[in-house]
């Protein structure tokens, strides 16, 4: 092969290597961006999906679906009503932990519904919620699971319901928080 042929081959090889490195870096940045955005939900989705590629596609799909939703903050009136409902649920816990935790679950679902999140089923709702509230969604699932679990002694059940109330409170506070406008400079 002539010198010119070797030079052309070297240039083509270099271009291919640079392209492969660029693609790899782009994928790495995309993965890192999803990991940063979704936090623990990223790891949970990878574990559940069985592969990083499948999980990342799922997370990107969630972002796309979320963009097409009309998620709105609560009105001041709705926020006040839900805050009163929440205070009642917390007071109820002393006398009836089971009913209080179920009421807390219902209140959080109501807030999600009023804000425009899908209410088809828990998986659809939590998938949409994970885009805007990736840390709260884990607590929402945990609280929901605690409320709907069975087979515990009365003491264990009360403790599970207490943990559910704590989880729901974190989620509730995040969901009812007024949207803050960015400060103007």
Identify what each model region corresponds to:
Residues 3-4, 72-75, 157-158:
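General structural signal for secondary-structure boundaries
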Residues 16-30:
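Cytosolic-side junction of a single-pass transmembrane alpha-helix
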Residues 142-185:
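Extracytoplasmic/periplasmic C-terminal soluble domains
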Residues 1-14:
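Feature marks short, highly hydrophobic, charge-poor N-terminal signal-anchor/signal peptide-like helices
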Residues 29-139, 143-153:
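Elongated extramembrane "stalk/tether" segments
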